[in-house]
């Protein structure tokens, strides 16, 4: 593996364990790869325990348990118990589907610290349509059970063109449920969301109206419910510091053991991300070519190389650059300084046109195989 000067590198602090790609829902904005149904076997319980131990020894302290739907793993409580023994702060990121009071109590006993529940819409018909599964009533029960079992209620609603008109109702639903935290996560366009972008990207006017409603409501519930509004990249003129900088803070392990600097990095060609089945976490973090590829600033092209903002945003998202320009070393096209910024503007302009002539692809194994066969 390619080497790096260890003394100059930070250690991973946040480990995202994508335990499985299995999921009973079929959300068309899912960030999982399009070809997920063709990927290899999931890591075993013992393999996950080894990964958690190695990452913790290296410095990781926050553990996200996601998927797919992590509740489909019957060994979830065992993994949580091991994480707790290692000293992680554990966060279950779930649709809530498959969670009941018995399982919540089991996870609580195992030492789980935090549960984040996603809801697609405050209205049953749209929620179940977007999820591809009748799940709305159960999600509401789960949200209440979570709080009854002593957890803070953390709701996440992914925002897009299909539900952005419901912003006021989303906020009222969260308030009525007694949510302690509400994350309004505007869709980021990777994986299935990019495939369905023409159906999902709101217009500029829709976004501005929804943001104003959210900001106003934030003042109304100040001290009672914290609202986090994640602005979509496409409506910024400067990119975010993706993952706080490539290979500096975040480490994702996919269900088949592939180690990723960010959860979408699997889409980058020629990156050759290593597997935890072949290398230790220490080797992957310090030695792998994939994790060293976009560290520091030497890889940058203009306009990033001479930009005074490069130490703030690190050139933006490598995956977004590749998906929109074909070159993962290009400046993130979200940036107004990028020579490819017009591609973001074109995507926004396309929201004014009807997307009815294009199918909406739901995230399921049949579509995964058909699209990548």
Curated annotation (Swiss-Prot):
Positions annotated to bind [4Fe-4S] cluster: 23, 27, 30
GO molecular function, one term: cyclase activity
Pathway: Cofactor biosynthesis; pyrroloquinoline quinone biosynthesis
Domain Radical SAM core intervals: 9-224
Reactions catalysed, as given in the entry: [PQQ precursor protein] + S-adenosyl-L-methionine = E-Y cross-linked-[PQQ precursor protein] + 5'-deoxyadenosine + L-methionine + H(+)
GO biological process, one term: pyrroloquinoline quinone biosynthetic process
Top EC category: oxidoreductase
UniProt xrefs under SMART domains: Elp3
Cofactor dependency: [4Fe-4S] cluster
Signal peptide residue numbers: none
Record key words, sorted: 4Fe-4S, Iron, Iron-sulfur, Metal-binding, Oxidoreductase, PQQ biosynthesis, S-adenosyl-L-methionine
Subunit structure: Interacts with PqqD. The interaction is necessary for activity of PqqE.
HAMAP family for this protein: PqqE (MF_00660)
Similarity-based family: Belongs to the radical SAM superfamily. PqqE family.
Function description: Catalyzes the cross-linking of a glutamate residue and a tyrosine residue in the PqqA protein as part of the biosynthesis of pyrroloquinoline quinone (PQQ).
The protein, known as: PqqA peptide cyclase
Lineage, highest ranks first: Bacteria, Pseudomonadati, Pseudomonadota, Gammaproteobacteria, Methylococcales
């Amino acid at each position: 593996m390619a080497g790096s000067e260890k003394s100059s590198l930070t250690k991973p602090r946040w480990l995202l364990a994508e335990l499985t790609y299995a999921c009973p829902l079929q959300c068309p904005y899912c960030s999982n790869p399009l070809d997920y149904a063709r990927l290899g076997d999931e890591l075993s319980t013992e393999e996950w325990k080894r990964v958690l131990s190695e990452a913790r020894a290296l410095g990781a302290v926050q553990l996200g348990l996601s998927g797919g739907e992590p509740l489909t793993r019957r060994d979830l409580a065992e993994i949580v118990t091991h994480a707790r023994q290692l000293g992680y702060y554990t966060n279950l990121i779930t649709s809530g589907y498959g969670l009941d009071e018995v399982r919540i109590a089991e996870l609580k006993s195992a030492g789980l610290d935090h549960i984040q529940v996603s809801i697609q819409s405050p209205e049953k018909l749209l929620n179940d349509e977007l999820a591809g599964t009748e799940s709305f009533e159960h999600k509401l029960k789960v949200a209440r059970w979570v709080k009854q079992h002593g957890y803070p209620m953390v709701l996440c609603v992914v925002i897009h063109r299909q539900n952005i008109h419901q912003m006021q109702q989303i906020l009222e639903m969260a308030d009525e449920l007694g949510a302690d935290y509400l994350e309004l996560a505007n869709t980021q366009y990777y994986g299935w969301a990019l495939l369905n972008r023409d159906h999902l990207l709101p217009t500029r006017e829709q976004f501005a109206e929804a943001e104003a409603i959210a900001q106003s409501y934030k003042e109304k519930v100040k001290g009672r419910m914290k609202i986090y509004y994640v602005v979509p990249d496409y409506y910024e003129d400067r990119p975010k510091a993706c993952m706080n900088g490539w290979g500096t803070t975040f480490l994702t392990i996919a269900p088949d053991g592939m180690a990723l600097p960010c959860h979408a990095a699997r889409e980058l060609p020629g990156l050759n991300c290593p597997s935890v089945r072949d290398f230790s976490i220490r080797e992957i973090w310090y030695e792998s070519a994939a994790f060293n590829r976009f560290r520091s600033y030497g890889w940058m092209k203009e306009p990033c190389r001479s930009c005074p903002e490069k130490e703030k945003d690190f050139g933006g998202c490598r995956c977004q650059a590749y998906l929109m320009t074909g070159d993962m070393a290009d400046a993130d096209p979200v940036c107004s300084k990028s020579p490819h910024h017009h591609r973001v503007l074109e995507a926004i302009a396309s929201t004014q046109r009807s997307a009815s002539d294009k199918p909406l692809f739901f995230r399921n194994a049949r579509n995964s195989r058909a699209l990548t066969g």
